[in-house]
């Protein structure tokens, strides 16, 4: 599991995928979401889904955990 540190208390799913270098842009994000992404074990298809401290994202064989910094 890889921790992704964010500023503030929220990040959107699409932004997280870019920050983690899983997606390069909008087209990549769309393809990844179509292949299947889990947020806290539940399927998610919305790139705008809000993620908060402790949320877990499973995408393209990687597991990410959101860690909020202040």
Sequence positions of predicted segments:
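A detector for short, charged/polar N-terminal pre-domain segments
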Residues: 1-11
């Amino acid at each position: 599991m890889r921790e992704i540190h964010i500023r503030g208390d929220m990040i959107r799913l699409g932004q997280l995928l870019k920050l983690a270098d899983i997606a390069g842009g909008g087209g990549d994000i769309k393809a990844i979401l179509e292949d299947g992404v889990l947020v806290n074990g539940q399927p998610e298809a919305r790139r705008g889904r809000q993620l908060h401290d402790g949320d877990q994202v499973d995408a393209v064989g990687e597991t990410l955990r959101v860690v909020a910094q202040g």
